[in-house]
Amino acid sequence: MAYHSGYGAHGSKHRARAAPDPPPLFDDTSGGYSSQPGGYPAPGADVAFNVNHLLGDPMANMAMAYGSSIASHGKDMMNKELHRFVSVNKLKYFFAVDTAYVAKKLGLLVFPYTHQNWEVQYSRDVPLPPRQDLNAPDLYIPTMAFITYVLLAGMALGIQKRFSPEVLGLCASTALVWVVMEVLALLLGIYLATVRSDLSTFHLLAYSGYKYVGMILSVLTGLLFGSDGYYVALAWTSSALMYFIVRSLRTAALGPDSMGGPAPRQRLQLYLTLGAAAFQPLIIYWLTFHLVR
């Protein structure tokens, strides 16, 4: 995959007309949030000093700008490839979200312990879209969280004077590869355990992608409060994600159709769910520990 950089190049008079892009799969609701300049209270406070230091570092700003271009380019390419090989109508279900759903789902990912009903809701044997059912998996939050993770990784590398396009590209590709490997392992486990469920590859991709939310919170806390804050946030987000994965996958994989099966098969299904949950903290730590020093 080749990235075309425009740094230092003079604009040409004749530009090749690019082919029109396919329509986006979803509306980006993140545009409503804009950064506000200045206005940090208590200049002597530690948190304010850290925030000023992060935002005022020119290397960090350059890294974030480059990371933004990589994330935008990757998002456009993903949309084009998905339009070529995937049923867009089926995929749109996972992007049928609104602001209220996103806010509630983020809260559920951070603190899932008080949530009671984990059943996915149906209407005439058709699952309700995410904006109508908090338990429905979505791909909007994982996609936006991955882009945010790339931007945050670029800023962290810039602060540590370790930023380079190659390092940031390796960081982004590694995060994607781990999720793909996790989904493939889950598909293999479901096949070997002969689990009868409605889980598709998109469902597994959504559940695997929710870890990016915990990764963002861990890295951001580490940048603001140091390594101690990082490990506290890592422990909290990992525990919350493990609980969320166990309850969500157990409800989906161990549905009513599988409850009447043999006991060994039920144990295999339970082990598969617990194994998927236990693997989450290891991936989060592996993808974030080098960004906090």
UniProtKB/Swiss-Prot annotation:
Residues 2-138, 196-202, 250-271 are cytoplasmic. Residues 160-174, 226-229 are lumenal. One of its GO terms (cellular component) is endoplasmic reticulum membrane. It is found in: Endoplasmic reticulum membrane; Golgi apparatus membrane; Endoplasmic reticulum-Golgi intermediate compartment membrane. The chain crosses the membrane at residues 139-159, 175-195, 203-225, 230-249, 272-292. The modification N-acetylalanine is found at A2. Keywords: Acetylation, Endoplasmic reticulum, ER-Golgi transport, Golgi apparatus, Membrane, Phosphoprotein, Protein transport, Transmembrane, Transmembrane helix, Transport. Residues 1-37 are annotated as: Disordered. Possible role in transport between endoplasmic reticulum and Golgi. Interacts with YIPF5. Belongs to the YIF1 family. This is Protein YIF1A. It comes from Bos taurus.
